[in-house]
UniProtKB/Swiss-Prot annotation:
Record localization: Cell membrane
Keyword Kinase among record annotations: no
Name of this protein: TRPM8 channel-associated factor 2
Function summary: Negatively regulates the plasma membrane cation channel TRPM8 activity. Involved in the recruitment of TRPM8 to the cell surface. Promotes prostate cancer cell migration stimulation in a TRPM8-dependent manner.
Keywords linked to the UniProt accession: Cell membrane, Membrane, Transport
Assembly and binders: Interacts with TRPM8 (via N-terminus and C-terminus domains); the interaction inhibits TRPM8 channel activity. Interacts with TRPV6.
Superkingdom field: Eukaryota
Gene3D superfamilies: Peptidase M60, enhancin-like domain 2, Peptidase M60, enhancin-like domain 3
Similarity comment: Belongs to the TCAF family.
GO biological process: hematopoietic progenitor cell differentiation
Keyword Transport: yes
Domain Peptidase M60: 543-842
InterPro entries: Class_I_gatase-like (IPR029062), M60-like_N (IPR035423), Pep_M60_3 (IPR042279), Peptidase_M60_dom (IPR031161), TCAF (IPR051244)
Length: 919
């Protein structure tokens, strides 16, 4: 049986060479939503006239006018449809009396069809028009159990009698077909021009249902002027992408949605971006509106999941019939739950499709932080439930606040509508997408493209439309000399193109001109697979990037193969190392996201990245695989030197070849990633890397960490950073202007390299002895001082201008003249405290104290407690009462700590005494 959309389309269109539609009948345009429905016939204006869908165990074919089901000219298609709808050969084919002429068409082709007033108990095919209002429940259950339904009709005439705003949810046919995501609309379908498609036609981006949805907005926001979402949690941003989904709450930028709703089938959904919003008393007016809307005023038998006990209490207080339940039951009219389990996903989706109301809330940013390499849009439990409703929870956050309700006109912004306007604008037509929405379109589009699209025409259709848009528009040439605004159409194109490539779409035509913009334009990928061996053992407590020494060119895909044990060990593949996300930068010197990471959870995987990049295998913490062979196709070698392994001859040969644009210099403790052009003049990396290893040993020694490092630190140069001149992390990021500082042995020896060691110091900082914001940019500099003095022989006074004696003295005096206020104790002023301790007691107390902190099980979060612990422990190390010293610096000394330290000799001649005496 043809169970996939592609196979179904092929079966339905077998032998169909033309669409012979009778001209005297005007069809209705069909609206498709959800993940199951797809079009079979689409006219030249993009209107769907015949659609197919699945529901439960059964299938539907929906035709936009009942007369088409009785037209002999469509016999080839009708015969295919009936054949495809049959659950198995020989099952009964039954036709409602309203389509009696169809019986003759079927019998004329040898199909034994019978006229029956309703579908029988035996599962087969039932054919009916869309105007019957008495068989709704029976038809839905017939399909759900595995039957096939052929249904046809138009809704524009019904709308003229009952009102256009009632068509979607009250037209008889829609009460049946909507459960499978197909709606008859009151919009006339044009039948002048259409062609027979060879593959599933594209679904129109957007059908305007403003009036119906505006009425729903009004009901949900009735009597509400403000939404206060300061409810104790940080909400996620919501992505509203379904044609019948709409926003309810936006932040003050009108760009971040935290509350939304949708119609799906015969049911309704309300989504909050954090479950705390469903339990907060300040959200009470909205929650009551939501329950009324979801239940259509019935408000009986509301099921509240046990995770939302406070919501249950709130509803009981208002006399609503509700109860705490551990799971969804069939007798509920509304189900309220959090978005953190997908165990009942299918059951919830069918509950909504058949008329139930769903109130659900949750955030996905925490899940995303705990599952790097997995897409929150595809794998977060809440999104497994919600995506089909046209709503998704993004892993981005919304700053909690109190936001006014301005009854959002969804004509201003809706993802599909914005994409449609964007397409029109790029085609030099009358698109009117506001400039400020282009940034949101890029973010939303990138999110939407992370929803798994394989086998889902609704999503693949958007991919196809985007490919066409981007192919026509071309990729903007973005660089430091040619930046683009982050809220420009060019930035949106960059974001959409990036994520489209990550989704697996063929972007070769989009990327064909990329190489001409880069230094890799004269490179070609290896025709033969390359096998490299990486270390699959990671005893540490953090994931490790393992370099492959290979580079994937722009716009290319690579096939990566590993063994069965490796595929089940939690490995990931990463393309690129420039991990800063520049989405919120004012100007862009490169695309906002240029790296891609995915799970290597099968033995062979195809991976692509529009922007190319060095290839890495990420080994998870605790992994014990040992040596792992990785076979990679379609990549080029990149310059790579490993201290102690790469010979000078190998390096010279490597660097002379036409290689990837980025290379790496590595030791067991640090890896430098810089442009290949900066490595061309490096004749022998060994002395440079030996010095780097000496510096890294000093970093580890001061931090009381094992050496060699369990995970080498990484430093990567980039054309643009998300913050600062450099920033810490894994990897440490620096600007291109700092590359020479990293790779010039002479410069390091003579001038030092304060910045990189400062960032390495950040990576050693520990919560227990950090007092943010005071010491955040202070204690990291201890490593800069230590490395410069103990390894490079550069005194602190020469290592940084701020450490000249006159500068230090000036800061001390200013601090004391102000009364030593703690709020002034930051950065260089705070560093001075530690330098004075070091200059009297040496480095050893710091080293032993940092080691001791690693053994302390519990340290309070507040700064005052942490500062007193540091005071106490340091005093014990040096066997002196340091209370007078820290009091002079303005530290808040606790009485019990002062009393405990009274047994030690008091440090009265501390370095501040000379300044205090002169006041």
């Amino acid at each position: 049986m043809a169970t996939t959309p592609d196979a179904a389309f092929e079966a339905l269109m077998n032998g169909v060479t033309s669409w012979d539609l009778p001209k005297e009948f005007t069809p209705s345009e069909l609206l498709l939503i959800g993940e199951a429905a797809f079009p079979v016939m689409v006219n030249d204006k993009g209107q769907v006239l015949i659609a197919v869908s699945f529901y439960g165990q059964g299938r539907l074919v929906v035709v936009s006018h009942e007369s088409y089901l009785m037209h002999a000219g469509l016999a080839p298609f009708l015969l295919n449809a009936v054949s495809w709808l049959c659950p198995s050969p020989g099952t009964p084919i039954e036709v409602h009396s309203s389509l009696a002429s169809l019986v003759n068409i079927l019998r004329g082709s040898g199909i034994n069809a019978l006229v029956q007033p309703e579908p029988g108990e035996a599962l087969g095919v039932y054919c009916i028009d869309a105007y019957n209002d008495t068989l709704t429940k029976k038809l839905v259950q017939f399909v759900k159990r595995g039957g096939g339904l052929l249904i046809g009709g138009q809704a524009w005439n019904w709308a003229s009698q009952h009102g256009s705003d009632k068509v979607l949810f009250s037209f008889p046919g829609n009460k049946v077909t909507s459960v499978a995501g197909v709606y008859f609309t009151d919009v006339y379908g044009d039948i002048n021009r259409f062609k027979v498609s060879k593959k599933i036609p594209k679904i129109p981006l957007y059908i305007r249902c403003w009036e119906e949805l505006r009425h729903d907005q009004d009901q949900l926001l009735d009597g509400i002027s403000m939404l206060d979402v300061r409810t104790g949690g940080v909400p996620s941003q919501l992505l509203v992408h379904g044609s019948l989904a709409f926003p309810l709450g936006l932040d003050n930028s009108f760009l971040s949605c935290f509350l939304a709703a949708a119609h799906y089938g015969r049911g309704r959904v309300v989504l909050a971006a954090h479950e705390a919003m469903l339990c907060a008393p300040k959200m009470e007016p909205f929650l009551l509106n939501a329950i009324r809307w979801l239940s259509r005023g019935q408000e009986d038998n509301i099921g509240v999941n046990t995770r939302l006990k406070n919501l249950n209490s709130l509803l009981l207080k208002h006399g609503l019939k509700c109860s705490l339940e551990s799971h969804l039951t069939d007798d509920m009219c509304v189900y309220c739950c959090a978005a953190y389990s997908d165990q009942e996903a299918k059951k919830i989706q069918e509950f909504v499709a058949e008329g139930g109301g769903l109130l659900i809330g949750g955030q996905s940013w925490w899940w995303a932080s705990q599952n790097p390499g997995s897409s929150a849009l595809g794998s977060f439990p809440g999104n497994v439930i919600l995506n089909t409703f046209g709503l998704s929870i993004l892993p981005r956050t919304v700053s909690p606040g109190c936001f006014p309700i301005l009854h959002i006109d969804i004509r201003n912004y809706h993802f599909r509508g914005a994409l449609s306007e964007f397409q029109a604008m790029l085609n030099h037509k009358e698109g009117n997408l506001e400039k400020r929405y282009s940034g949101k379109l890029g973010v939303d589009g990138a999110g939407f493209l992370q929803i798994p699209a394989q086998g889902v025409p609704a999503y693949l259709s958007v991919h196809r439309i985007l490919r066409k848009i981007l192919r026509q528009a071309g990729l903007p040439a973005v660089s430091k000399s040619n930046p683009v605004s982050s809220h420009s159409y060019e930035a949106a194109i960059l974001q959409l193109a990036t994520e489209l490539a990550h989704s697996g779409s063929d972007c070769s035509q989009i990327a064909h001109n990329l190489s001409s913009q880069t230094c890799s334009s004269n490179l070609s990928s290896s025709e033969h697979p390359i096998t490299v061996e990486i270390n699959g053992t990671n005893p540490g407590d953090r994931d490790v990037w393992m370099s492959t020494g290979l580079y994937l060119l722009e716009g290319q895909s690579t096939e990566i193969s590993v063994s069965e044990p490796a595929a089940s060990a939690g490995l990931k593949v990463q393309i690129g190392c420039h991990t800063d996300d520049l989405t919120f930068a004012i100007k862009l010197f490169r695309a906002p996201v240029v790296t891609y990471q995915c799970c290597m959870n099968r033995t062979q995987r195809s991976v692509s990245c529009l922007w190319g990049g060095l290839l890495y295998i990420i080994v998870p913490k605790g992994c014990q695989l040992g040596p792992v062979s990785v076979t990679i196709t379609n990549a080029v070698p990149a310059p790579y030197y490993k201290l102690g392994k790469t010979s000078l001859e190998e390096w010279k040969s490597c660097i002379q070849k036409n290689l990837g644009p980025w290379g790496e210099l590595a030791t067991d403790n640090v890896i430098l990633t810089v442009p290949t052009a900066s490595l061309k003049t490096l004749e022998n990396p060994e002395p440079l890397l030996q010095l780097w290893d000496e510096m890294m040993q000093a970093v580890a020694r001061l931090a009381s960490q094992p050496f060699p490092f369990q995970r080498p630190e990484r430093i990567v140069a980039d054309v643009q950073l998300s913050a600062g001149w450099m920033h810490s992390g894994y990897p440490i990021m620096c600007h291109m202007e700092s590359v020479q500082e990293l790779v010039s042995l002479a410069n390091i020896r003579s001038k030092g390299l304060w910045g990189p060691i400062h960032e390495l110091g950040h990576n050693q900082q520990c919560r227990g002895w950090e007092f943010p914001p005071h010491t955040t940019e202070a204690t990291c500099n201890l490593w800069s001082v230590y490395v410069h003095e103990t390894v490079l022989g550069i005194p602190r006074a020469q290592a940084h201008p701020q450490l000249k004696p006159e500068e230090r003295e000036k800061r001390i005096k200013e601090h004391l003249q102000k009364g030593a206020p703690l709020q002034n104790w930051n950065v260089w002023t705070a560093l001075e405290t530690y330098l004075q301790l070091q200059e009297v007691f040496g480095w050893e107390p710091f080293i032993t104290l940092f080691a001791e902190y690693q053994t302390i099980f519990y340290i309070p979060e507040d700064n005052e407690c942490k500062m007193n612990i540091w005071l106490k422990l340091f005093s014990e190390k040096v066997q002196k009462n340091l209370v007078p010293f820290f009091e002079a610096w303005g530290w808040p000394i606790q009485k019990d700590v002062a009393e405990d330290l009274a047994c030690y000799p008091s440090w009265e001649d501390h370095p501040l005494r000379m300044y205090m005496g002169s006041e």
